Amino acid sequence: MDYFNIKQNYYTGNFVQCLQEIEKFSKVTDNTLLFYKAKTLLALGQYQSQDPTSKLGKVLDLYVQFLDTKNIEELENLLKDKQNSPYELYLLATAQAILGDLDKSLETCVEGIDNDEAEGTTELLLLAIEVALLNNNVSTASTIFDNYTNAIEDTVSGDNEMILNLAESYIKFATNKETATSNFYYYEELSQTFPTWKTQLGLLNLHLQQRNIAEAQGIVELLLSDYYSVEQKENAVLYKPTFLANQITLALMQGLDTEDLTNQLVKLDHEHAFIKHHQEIDAKFDELVRKYDTSN
């Protein structure tokens, strides 16, 4: 089956269109359709149990339950038999990463990538790259990517090639490689071909990385326009925390006050990685001040 349009819309953040593509196969049942439908509904805040009779359906339900409770025990128990599909391991690894257990999450990803079942391994590879980069293991991310692509180079389908390109772009971004050439052109083309919040934010990050302040400001103003803020209001809500973090970064580069933007982000998502990172920096600074405060 051809999943290209489904995955294309999902990974460019066009979730409404992704659902429409999935509905074209309403008479077909398979794990890929179930996985992407559930993940898309979850992104839109519209999740409902899809197939509680199948193992993947049960795993999806327990994963959504975990997102609410942050209790991973039931999810782990269901998957302890080691006979799990890549999609099922994807959900477990994501839950482990959310809890901050990045090493264990990466182990789960690798277990699934080495699985004999091909369906879902490319998605799991992308997650492995994301987890490794979050854990500041750039060399690990590069090694996993190279090993995987070398092993399957003659059998890559179009829909999976798209995921591999995305994974490679993350590694290039993290290593600051080709930021003004191929990686930049990749995101520029995506944002022009699929003008969504996710693609524009990707391009915005590339401009911020290169300190292209005028171009970054242009994308901020574009995302504040009616086309994005009104006509794509579901995505506007979904990507608001990321957008605020980018706006704060840009404002700092411009020497502008960031208090209002920061307060908005804290109110919207006080656990956001940007906020936690700056809280850690502030804590270290305060510790240094106390250490060298000669008045004590």
From Swiss-Prot:
Gene3D superfamilies linked: Tetratricopeptide repeat domain (1.25.40.10)
Biological-process GO terms, alphabetical: endoplasmic reticulum to Golgi vesicle-mediated transport; intra-Golgi vesicle-mediated transport; late endosome to vacuole transport via multivesicular body sorting pathway; protein transport; retrograde vesicle-mediated transport, Golgi to endoplasmic reticulum; vesicle coating
Transmembrane domains' residue ranges: none
UniProt subcellular location: Cytoplasm; Golgi apparatus membrane; Cytoplasmic vesicle, COPI-coated vesicle membrane
Function, in words: The coatomer is a cytosolic protein complex that binds to dilysine motifs and reversibly associates with Golgi non-clathrin-coated vesicles, which further mediate biosynthetic protein transport from the ER, via the Golgi up to the trans Golgi network. The coatomer complex is required for budding from Golgi membranes, and is essential for the retrograde Golgi-to-ER transport of dilysine-tagged proteins.
Name of the protein: Coatomer subunit epsilon
Keywords on record: Cytoplasm, Cytoplasmic vesicle, ER-Golgi transport, Golgi apparatus, Membrane, Protein transport, Transport
Family matches, as InterPro entries: Coatomer_esu, TPR-like_helical_dom_sf
Disulfide pattern: none
Pfam families assigned: Coatomer_E (PF04733)
Membrane topology of this protein: Peripheral membrane protein
Complex and partners: Oligomeric complex that consists of at least the alpha, beta, beta', gamma, delta, epsilon and zeta subunits. Interacts with the ESCRT-0 subunit VPS27.
Protein family according to the UniProt entry: Belongs to the COPE family.
One Gene Ontology molecular-function label: promoter-specific chromatin binding
One Gene Ontology CC term in the entry: COPI vesicle coat
